[in-house]
């Protein structure tokens, strides 16, 4: 399998936008799940069942936050690298012009 490297700054920024959309989707779904767990806890669950449910949801919330952080990290890296490619391209063109 041949590896393809992304070197087009515009394509890199487009891809960064996709990662941002994915991060937003994960955040939205995590919020819905958290709200749903609060409704369960308020629907008569008590004691160990409620505590276990909240603990599980807390762990899932942490996992989703980690996923969002990773997606944002990739997004930020793509934008940073796109900017670096453009700066290097401009510097190379200036050198070639003499």
Curated annotation (Swiss-Prot):
Location within or outside the cell: Secreted
Phenotype upon loss of function: Disruption of the gene results in decreased dissemination independent of burden.
Stimuli inducing this protein: Expression is increased upon phosphate starvation and during infection.
Bridged cysteine pairs (disulfide): none
Keyword Transcription listed: no
Any one GO CC term of the record: extracellular region
Keyword Protease part of the UniProt annotation: no
InterPro entries cross-referenced by the UniProt entry: ESAT-6-like_sf (IPR036689), T7SS_ESAT-6-like (IPR010310)
Domain of life: Bacteria
Key words of the record: Secreted, Virulence
UniProt cross-references to NCBIfam families, sorted A to Z: WXG100_ESAT6
Extra facts: M.marinum contains the ancestral full-length version of EsxM rather than the truncated inactive version which is present in other modern Mtb lineages, including M.tuberculosis H37Rv. Reconstitution of this ancestral version of EsxM in M.tuberculosis H37Rv alters the migratory mode of infected macrophages, enhancing their motility.
Biological role stated in the UniProt entry: Alters the host macrophage cytoskeleton and enhances macrophage motility. Promotes granuloma efflux, extrapulmonary dissemination of infection and bone disease.
Protein family per UniProt: Belongs to the WXG100 family. CFP-10 subfamily.
Protein name, as recorded: ESAT-6-like protein EsxM
Gene label: esxM
């Amino acid at each position: 399998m041949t590896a393809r490297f992304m070197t087009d700054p515009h394509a890199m920024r487009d891809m960064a936008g996709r990662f941002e959309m994915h991060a937003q989707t994960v955040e939205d779904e995590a919020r819905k799940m958290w709200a749903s767990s609060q409704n369960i806890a308020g629907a008569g669950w008590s004691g160990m069942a409620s505590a276990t449910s909240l603990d599980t949801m807390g762990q899932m919330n942490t996992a989703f936050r980690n996923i969002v952080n990773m997606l944002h990290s990739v997004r930020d890296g793509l934008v940073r690298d796109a900017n670096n490619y453009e700066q290097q391209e401009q510097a190379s063109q200036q050198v070639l012009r003499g």
